[in-house]
From Swiss-Prot:
A Pfam family matched in the record: Myb_DNA-binding
Residue ranges flagged as DNA-binding region: 63-88
Cited function: Transcriptional regulator required for Nod-factor-induced gene expression. Transcription activator involved in the induction of NIN and ENOD40 genes, which are required for rhizobial infection and early nodule development. Possesses strong transactivation activity in vitro. Does not seem to contribute to the early steps of the arbuscular mycorrhizal fungus infection and colonization processes in roots.
Stored InterPro entries: Homeodomain-like_sf, Myb_CC_LHEQLE, Myb_dom, Myb_dom_plants, PHR1-like, SANT/Myb
Residue window of motif LHEQLE: 139-144
More info: Roots of plants silencing IPN2 exhibit decreased rhizobial infection and nodule organogenesis under nitrogen limitation when inoculated with Mesorhizobium loti.
Name of the protein in its database record: Myb family transcription factor IPN2
GO molecular function, one term: DNA-binding transcription factor activity
Family: Belongs to the MYB-CC family.
Length: 358
């Protein structure tokens, strides 16, 4: 190799006068080492790659064919052979250039990857934050809705409770008002009922007395019946011996000058018959108990005797024994029709005799 380059070195050194580098007319750059070496520049490497490509690749290309295709003066087979071998092994002759390019590419790819990763991570983080914010917002809205519904339910319950309380109060007030009205209505209504009982008590009592008198029961049975009928009337109304009389008073045009009218029975004709029969009653003197009944009189203006004088027995007479009278069986009587017919006949005759109108 040294034999091939001796004439080239002095010419290069003479032309440039530089001991460090020698450059020929072909553009080759050689080192200034004791054994000069060819430096593959970028242009020279590009021409080598083009020649290899034209020849069909590094496997088909040979140093001779490459040297013929390149046509560079000063380029020997040694240079091409070593460079082709490195090229085939993938090692570029221009190491620094390749290292820088590789490093730059790796840096660029790393930066791009970092950028992509950062952007993707930023997007992912942003999306995650947005999703978390959206989830929190929806949860907050659901909580607000639940709270609102709870408030509405509580308000509805309070409203229903107030309505029920008002209804209870209204019903209680109505019940109290109706009860008070009933109490007010019951108070004055009892008095007329008592008056009605007082009015109808004596005529009903005397109807049974008339039957007893005309049936022959005697004064004892009449007194017993009167004593048994008196307690219910005494329980309903207070006894006033001065004002309570048999029957009720009616205005009488035939009364005297003292202004008091005699007792008028509800049935005048029947009571006149009763008085006439009592005057002629044969059983009047046979019993120990005497009953005083004053017949109505139109001529005198005196007042009727009170009930106490009529029904009370005389001091010298014996008191009535209710147990004795209840134990004694009553005599057998005739039917009611047979007893009423003589009563009506006798009453008609007595009326003809004692009627002031007739």
């Amino acid at each position: 190799m040294e034999r091939m380059f001796p004439p080239k070195k002095p010419s290069t050194m003479n032309s440039h006068d530089r001991p460090m580098c020698v450059q020929g007319d072909s553009g080759l750059v050689l080192t200034t080492d004791p054994k000069p070496r060819l430096r593959w520049t970028v242009e020279l490497h590009e021409r080598f790659v083009d020649a290899v490509t034209q020849l069909g690749g590094p496997d088909k290309a040979t140093p001779k064919t490459i040297m013929r295709v390149m046509g560079v003066k000063g380029l020997t087979l040694y240079h091409l052979k070593s460079h082709l071998q490195k090229f085939r092994l993938g090692k570029q002759p221009h190491k620094e250039f390749n290292d820088h390019s590789i490093k730059d590419g790796m840096r660029a790819s790393a930066l791009e990857l970092q950028r992509n990763t950062a952007s993707s991570s930023a997007m992912i983080g942003r999306n995650m934050n947005e999703m978390q914010i959206e989830v929190q917002r929806r949860l907050h809205e659901q909580l607000e809705v639940q709270k609102h519904l709870q408030l509405r339910i509580e308000a509805q319950g309070k409203y229903m409770q107030s309505i029920l309380e008002k209804a209870y109060q209204t019903l209680a007030g109505e019940n109290m008002a109706s009860a008070a009205t009933n109490l007010k209505g019951i108070g004055p209504q009892t008095i007329p009922d008592m008056g009605i009982m007082k009015e109808f008590g004596s005529p009903l009592g005397f109807s049974f007395q008339d039957l007893d008198l005309y049936g022959g029961g005697g004064g004892d049975q009449l007194e017993l019946q009167q004593n048994m009928e008196k307690p219910p009337l005494d329980g309903f109304m207070p006894m006033n011996h001065e004002n309570l009389c048999l029957g009720k008073k009616r205005p009488n045009p035939y009364s005297g000058n003292n202004g008091k009218s005699p007792l008028m029975w509800s049935d005048d004709l029947r009571l006149q018959d009763l008085g006439s029969c009592l005057q002629d009653d044969p059983f009047k003197g046979d019993h120990h108990h005497q009953i005083q009944i004053a017949p109505p009189s139109l001529d005198r203006g005196t007042e009727m005797d009170p009930m106490s004088e009529i029904y009370d027995s005389k001091p010298e007479e014996k008191k009535f024994d209710a147990s004795m009278k209840l134990e004694r069986p009553s005599p057998r009587r005739a039917p009611l029709g047979e007893r009423m017919s003589p009563m009506i006949t006798t009453g008609t005759m007595a009326q003809g005799r004692s009627s002031p109108f007739g």
